[in-house]
Amino acid sequence: MRRLLPAIFILMLATLAAAQTLPPVATFSIVAFDPQNGDLGVAVASRYFSVGSVVPWAMAGVGAVATQADVNVGYGPQAIDLLRQGLTAQEVLKKLLEEDTFEDKPGRQVAIVDAKGNIATYTGPNAPKWAGDRQGKTWSAQGNILVGPQVPEAMGKAFDETQGELAEKLFAALKAGDAAGGDARGKQSASMLIVRKRGGRNMNNDRYVYINVDDNPDPFKELRRLLDLNLSYNYGDKMYKALSANDLTGARAAAQKANSYSPNNRGIHLQLGFLNYALGDKVLSLEEFSKARELRPDDFGKSWLDESDSPLFKSMRDDKDFMKKLFPPDGVPPAPDAKKGSNQ
């Protein structure tokens, strides 16, 4: 009996270790290239915590990668580095698989798109079922532990049929994959990464879109909310860049796009009020100012005064008829409340 105890103890440890082994990264994802502007992106969803920290990789002007199933996370940075060296997507995939000496390699799933639109995919024979992939002219959709092939097929169809920029096409693909059944285990996390040269916010940032939902009962709803915010900020930045170049038409177009993603942003309505006036549309200008006032009535006057100091908009102050409509009855904006301070 005593001789059996060590063996039983070892067996228990082995069983415990096996139970603690992380499951495969079951997911459905899409990698894609936008030939119109060179954007590259990945969108992914899974019944797996924080899938965005594992699956999506991308570099502007280089390529995008999704690595999943019995995942080798190293495939992501390795693939990007090889693409930077000038290898095609197909050459990179071949090299990754040749150099992967781990025993679980047959369970891998990976998709690569390079900056020229070349696509390479691999779904190993041991990838958790159902596993597979489908390709289009500019995209590859793939997944494992799915309800069936209808998931990547629906994703590709939605991608091709959706109008607009890459972010919208990727999101539509994810939603279609979910509607087709998605991950057979359910929902938990989602992520989207899109890269564009100098497309990110602030300086030296190529991440045009980078949003993650790590743990949420409805990750698609939350991903949509974050995407709207991300794109609203992107177009807001575009508006200010156009303003700095005295491009009022471009600034208004960017502001209108920002407003479509964030309709309750007081600052955007305020800018649209000034821009419409400067471009000769006083009716729309008053409408936008009215929306800005409704959203933040307490400090509308101060906000208007701050923005009207711009040389682009000072002429509005001399337009008495317009000012009376904007600040009835005498056309004089309210003085800032000194008690509230400059940040109110």
Q: Which role does the model predict for each range below?
A:
Residues 283-300:
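TPR/TPR-like (Sel1-like) alpha-helical repeat modules
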Residues 20-185, 192, 214-256, 260-261, ...:
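Alpha/propeptide regions of enzymes that mature by internal proteolysis
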Residues 298-344:
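Terminal, low-structured helical/coil segments at or just beyond the last alpha-helical repeat
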Residues 236-237, 267-271, 301-307:
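Alpha-solenoid helical repeat scaffolds
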Residues 269-276, 288:
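TPR/Sel1-like alpha-solenoid repeat signature
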Residues 6-16:
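Bacterial N-terminal signal peptides
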Residues 255, 261-262, 296-299, 303:
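Alpha-helical junction/boundary sensor with strong preference for TPR arrays
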Residues 1-4:
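Positively charged n-region of N-terminal signal peptides that target proteins for export
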